[in-house]
From Swiss-Prot:
The lineage of its organism: Bacteria, Pseudomonadati, Pseudomonadota, Gammaproteobacteria, Pasteurellales. The keyword rRNA-binding does not apply. Pfam families: DXP_redisom_C, DXP_reductoisom, DXPR_C. HAMAP family: DXP_reductoisom (MF_00183). GO terms for molecular function: 1-deoxy-D-xylulose-5-phosphate reductoisomerase activity; manganese ion binding; NADPH binding. The gene is dxr. This is 1-deoxy-D-xylulose 5-phosphate reductoisomerase. Gene3D superfamilies: 1.10.1740.10, NAD(P)-binding Rossmann-like Domain (3.40.50.720). Disulfide bonds: none annotated. Catalyzes the NADPH-dependent rearrangement and reduction of 1-deoxy-D-xylulose-5-phosphate (DXP) to 2-C-methyl-D-erythritol 4-phosphate (MEP). InterPro entries: DXP_reductoisomerase (IPR003821), DXP_reductoisomerase_C (IPR013644), DXP_reductoisomerase_N (IPR013512), DXPR_C (IPR026877), DXPR_C_sf (IPR036169), NAD(P)-bd_dom_sf (IPR036291). It catalyses: 2-C-methyl-D-erythritol 4-phosphate + NADP(+) = 1-deoxy-D-xylulose 5-phosphate + NADPH + H(+). Belongs to the DXR family.
Length: 396
């Protein structure tokens, strides 16, 4: 049995991961669960999966969890704080770590798993957006296996030759006959909405994604296509791709999850129903296959598959992300932090939908260029960018 730690078990990806475990109980043992403050859900997960450890970032929440588990007679040991979570990620008994904590909070525990040479199922975008070079270098040093969980990157991974799959982060695409990585995106819920109506978009409208079931933050990112911008940055790092080797296409049906174009004219695509359990199951079992509990794709129900070029006037956040990568790691780190603040402000109705990109752009343009050499640099830039973003929100 493979022993698994889930960083972010109470979130959307974490819950989907546990549902895949339920489908394959003889293959996987949940060794540790990590969450933020959701005591009720964590207690329910501990009751169901009986992990050896459960960790919450918040100390008071951890104490409340300990009390609940005692009443439920669950023997799971409760930990709290970043240090304990990092130690759990690197625990010698652990085979694989699902890195699904949203935001900068997931950086250190994910890096801890990478340094320990674990099989790391990477669902935390920020790891590569803010620390791409650091993560790739550490994985090469430790021998950690990085497997992308994001549906698009997982699709690209599956469409690449086996040699490239063994060299995530440093695969020579051109040598393997790859000409383009084609990243697809649905275009979100406002793909055909008139631009003059964007100022009136509400949080409720923005979180209603047409195809995927996701958390609020990532749903807003999908609506602005910042999500695709972050995925562009991730793909550049994961697949060692140049700007010329990248292509972004809007595919509203979300059936083709991404593609790889080869120099002989072939295009290999990965398809399936839009359900995160598929890429989760793929990374958990790789190089084998397991049941993900996902309905098979019914080709006879597909009316059409359409492809559209992205419009940067409609999706300025996408252009901002592409340009930020060209600027360097400091710019992508600052943009990511600013976006977290801006999206939170929008969800709390402090700013309009169209102001999200204005906050992000203000921060990227005003942050001082810094060379990112270690994670302390990343955390410093992240902190500065959040302060700048908060000020930008107030100034709007």
């Amino acid at each position: 049995m493979k022993k698994l730690v889930i960083l972010g078990s109470t979130g959307s990806i974490g819950k989907s991961t546990l549902s895949v475990v339920e489908q394959n109980k003889t293959e996987y043992e949940v060794f540790g669960l990590v969450g933020g403050k959701n005591v009720e859900l964590m207690a329910a997960q501990c009751l169901l999966f009986q992990p050896k450890f459960a960790a919450l970032d918040d100390e008071n929440a951890a104490k409340a969890l300990e009390e609940q588990l005692r009443q439920l007679n669950v023997k799971t040991e409760v930990l709290s704080g970043q240090k304990a979570i990092c130690e759990l990620s690197a625990h010698p008994e652990v085979d694989m770590v699902m890195a699904a904590i949203v935001g900068a909070a997931g950086l250190l525990p994910t890096l801890s798993a990478v340094k320990a040479g674990k099989k790391v199922l990477l669902a935390n975008k920020e790891s590569l957006v803010t620390c791409g070079q650091i993560f790739i270098d550490e994985a090469r040093k430790s021998g950690a296996q990085l497997l992308p969980v994001d549906s698009e990157h997982n699709a690209i991974f599956q469409s690449l030759p086996p040699e490239a799959q063994q060299k995530v982060g440093f695969c020579p695409l051109a040598e393997l006959g790859v000409s383009k990585i084609i990243l697809t995106g649905s275009g979100g819920p406002f793909r055909v909405k008139p631009l003059d109506e964007f100022a009136a978009i509400t949080p409720a409208q923005a979180v209603a994604h047409p195809n995927w079931s996701m958390g609020k933050k990532i749903s807003v990112d999908s609506a602005t296509m910042m999500n695709k911008g972050l995925e562009y940055i991730e793909a550049r790092w994961l697949f060692n791709a140049s700007a010329e080797e990248m292509e972004i296409i809007i595919h509203p049906q979300s059936i083709i999850h991404s593609m790889v174009r080869y120099i002989d004219g072939s295009v290999i695509a990965q398809m399936g129903n839009p359900d995160m359990c598929t890429p989760i199951a793929h990374t958990m079992a790789y190089p084998k296959r397991i049941n993900a509990g996902v309905a098979p794709l019914d080709f006879f129900k597909l009316k059409e598959l359409t492809f559209i070029e992205p419009d940067f006037a409609r999706y300025p956040n996408l252009k901002l992300a592409i340009d930020a990568f060209a600027e360097g790691q400091y710019a992508t780190t600052a943009m990511n932090a600013a976006n977290e603040v801006a999206v939170e402000a929008f969800l709390n109705e402090r700013i309009r939908f169209i102001d999200i990109v204005n906050v992000n752009r203000t921060v990227v343009e005003n942050i001082a260029p810094v060379q990112v050499k270690e994670i302390a640099d990343v955390l410093h830039i992240d902190k500065l960018a959040r302060e700048l973003a908060e000020q930008a929100v107030i100034n709007l």
